[in-house]
């Protein structure tokens, strides 16, 4: 039975405890889209995300041209076209694919990274996480860039930062697209050309001769245009690399600051390790707000009536910490919480409904294996507190310069 907020607070034995690391930083920088209706309860968020009466409303979705939906990234599609396209990529994210295709890549990468860490006695954890996430992502894409996987990831990040900010006003679009269009488009165009020429085009040449079960092979088979290929690879690349990198950094930060949590993670079995990571993500989700546009009214929505045409923002952090759902002490770390509440352990961290992140399990496996390796390195410790940055395009935090030290091998 759900408890009200008053009883939940009084039931909390550590009412003043707050284990979140990004809450204050996010509150300072997060700027929901103008005119959006924000859903903060877990039930309200789930209701909207699962509703058939909404469609994608963020990430410049209003500026996407749907001349040929078959060649639009499935991230931007809704309804039956989205279901069909999502089914076509489901094989990349099955438990079998994770274990047989990605686990070997993760294991090889971690052996290399930990050997380098011990050889020098120091490393930058967020850069290590970037390399791992990049290696897995290029396998999914079919882009053979493992000689320098971080270069591709950094290029994708630069393209994303050079992109127009989401939900621009009409005046901003007028000046940025028409009056000074050449100025705003030039950096992105240059970087995008570099991405296609140096990464996608070589992969196309290889996959035409030797197709595999990956994104590039699929796009060749379906006759994607150059622009469509760039968009699809950008979507996979930014989602697969950026979020995983930040999640790993945040989880590591929690463990370095709390030795008992680190030890609990190392002592736990696989399921227990996943529970710890999911609870960290509940407290410090990478993404801030995800958006949906209502095609028709939802008059009985939990957080208030929604009218047709409304832009609705899902406050992931607030939903993840809704006492009605997560129980007492919503800001405190508790790996046993999911057992008591009987809710999906990730809550809203990876979204919900038809657009729930398809690669969430891949990210969790990457994070678990990365941290299980790094935290076992003799003498590993945090040498420098990381810097937190804010990405206005994705409305998410970024963790940088997380320097770690360890016992150096002779």
For each of these PLM feature ranges, what is it?
Residues 2-410:
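Cytochrome P450
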